[in-house]
């Protein structure tokens, strides 16, 4: 059978099936509603039958969510490879962040710098990671993020420090300012309230804190009892996500309370989860370094494998506002960009903004908002 004809038949069958469900449920509702409203009791319907129907409907709704998700998303749709701007001088890229205007921030293994790239992957700026002073010393950033005020922030594991880059400095090119000490900072992010999030790998903690305009730490909070926390990111509904070394991925709410782990909620078995992020529709995306995959965990439905091949050692992970998935492939020394949606990622409750949108303010273009 011709592939096009076969696909057309499958489409017709799917639409007819969904339509039949809609018609039958509408008809039943129209007939049952007045009977239940105007008569006492349930007629001959038993409690067991109601329970059975509820369970079947729950399963059907789950299946419909899966069908919808499988129509919306695409697998292994690689659209671009961005070479490591450091070349082969250092290790592969490991930390990655994408701002509102589409600018890409990258750290690489053993590289004393942060690269800032355009949407298309062209280098816009290089921030050398050097502490200026009597004895200028370089440091090696593990991961990178951007604060609400547009400042670049990094985790420096070797020096057990968190640093932000300030352009307002006595040095003409700006300077890195140490804002705090953490035993073993690994991943860094920003939560929905603008606080900086830092994973403390050996201590099994995530620290969150705010900064005032004098770079003083305020409103500190710590989440404990984690097992080798690696990457941290803003999560859906104002919470945050944390990946654990060779373990699970956990979602915390904005009160720093555990909501669930992805393993327990979705029944998913990770190998070694690394980069985590959430897209603008509230889906959670996770890179698995051991399995060399990227999975999407939707709000409703089963997990979907977005990338099942072509990754050697996926580490950092981020989503752009234009609906693309960016994966730092340390093993292949590049950033791999995937188009994982059939259409642009926008809806009535999740407005989509292109990095080329003229409606972006100058502050939005730099990812900048007040602290």
State the predicted function of each range:
Residues 78-87, 123-135, 171-179, 215-223, ...:
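A short beta-strand motif characteristic of beta-propeller blades
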Residues 112-115, 160-162, 204-206, 248-250, ...:
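Structural signal for beta-propeller blades
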Residues 118-122, 166-170, 210-214, 253-257, ...:
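Short loop/turn segments that connect beta-strands within beta-propeller blades
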Residues 314-371:
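Blade-level signature of beta-propeller repeat domains, shared across WD40, Kelch, NHL, RCC1
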